[in-house]
Amino acid sequence: MKTGIVSAVLALVMPVCVYATTLRLSTDIDLLVLDGKKVSSSLLRGADSIELDNGPHQIVFRIEKNIRLSNHEQRLYISPPLVVSFNTQKISQVNFNLPRLENEQESEAFEAAPRIELLDGDAMPIPVKLDILALTKTPKGTDYEADTERYNKAGKSASLPGFATMMADDSTLLSGVSELDVIPPQSQTLTEQRLKFWFQQADPETRTRFLQWAKQQPSS
């Protein structure tokens, strides 16, 4: 049932439109933030795609890939966090198209001038805005969600201010807890709070679909 709750929250956090878009995940991509919300790795474990609504989106991610060194050994290359904004209007599928990253020279060139493509289901390029997310170090470590909020409020090249506002409002409602993850039993009150809030925000059609889905779920 806890997994079902997370699926419900994911479905309700995003506006629902007539069209839906499938974001295909790459094994070389570590997705950090989606539309202003931190995405937990445990939530994505084993998933090869995410369903998005039709409209503007923003993702923050890193590329993690083994590259060859000059001595023929390998090491894990981790890129800086990248911000990509795009619009999926009337697009049914989004695929990552990453540049070649096989050795130190190619990874260094990518660090100097990052570039990625997003392709639709017909392998046609989707217009994107790409930038590097500046990170703020804190005693608690890196907070990608907070850094994304600051980025969006700063009016940068790939900023989407609407997601910064949505994130701030949701964080206040949820007492600062906004990581989309499987919620432990002791936090069921928070789960209920989330579900009630997003249910109230949804349109009648979305509420009906959610209630139909909930009736089909096991009680425990």
Swiss-Prot record:
Short name of any one Pfam family annotated for the protein: DUF2057
Q: Which InterPro entries match?
A: UPF0319
Question: Quick one: signal sequence residues?
Answer: 1-20
The UniProt keyword set, sorted, is: Signal
Instruction: Give the family this protein belongs to, as stated in its UniProt record.
Output: Belongs to the UPF0319 family.
- Protein name, as recorded: UPF0319 protein Ent638_1476
Provide the species name.
Enterobacter sp. (strain 638)
